[in-house]
Amino acid sequence: MKVLLCDLLLLSLFSSVFSSCQRDCLTCQEKLHPALDSFDLEVCILECEEKVFPSPLWTPCTKVMARSSWQLSPAAPEHVAAALYQPRASEMQHLRRMPRVRSLFQEQEEPEPGMEEAGEMEQKQLQKRFGGFTGARKSARKLANQKRFSEFMRQYLVLSMQSSQRRRTLHQNGNV
């Protein structure tokens, strides 16, 4: 929720005016992101706008800006969106620890065009199945017509009925 709120705040900043401070901070984030895990875009923009240059966050940015003239162009909004929604390294490791979130993260990371059906199959496997215990006296037709009766239980019922019929025939023939 906190990240969503921060993103909303940043988007409101970008929608009003795309100033040079915002462009400089985005450039700095793109250049220094692997080196600085604690880089905060909001703090960088505030420090730039207030001209608080000797701060520990803005000093490496000024060095990067002086070293290279690479900047984001205002005509490339996909770079701005990518910079806004790029999670930090600490957030990435936290997400990779959780197995369910890890699978969602991998799907977002590498979307393949032909894998939509596999995603639907995986979702069906994770759905909770509602089916009750079946009594021994219920008929096979009643159970076969129920919507929530699982395929596994149908197979079990058929196998149990076949084995009980075999036992009866063996018992009647005197082989048991």
Swiss-Prot record:
Pfam family, one: Opiods_neuropep
GO cellular component, as recorded: axon terminus; dendrite; extracellular region; neuronal cell body; plasma membrane; synaptic membrane
Main localization, broad class: secreted
UniProt-annotated location(s): Secreted
Signal peptide: 1-19
Post-translational modification comment from the UniProt entry: Specific enzymatic cleavages at paired basic residues probably yield other active peptides besides nociceptin.
Keyword Acetylation: no
A single GO BP: sensory perception of pain
Record-linked InterPro entries: Nociceptin, Opioid_neupept
Keyword line: Cleavage on pair of basic residues, Disulfide bond, Neuropeptide, Neurotransmitter, Opioid peptide, Secreted, Signal
Domain of life: Eukaryota
Tissue and organ distribution: Predominantly expressed in the brain and spinal cord. Also expressed and secreted by peripheral blood neutrophils following degranulation.
Listed GO MF terms: neuropeptide hormone activity; opioid peptide activity
Family of the protein in this entry: Belongs to the opioid neuropeptide precursor family.
Name the record gives this protein: Prepronociceptin
Species per Swiss-Prot/TrEMBL record: Homo sapiens
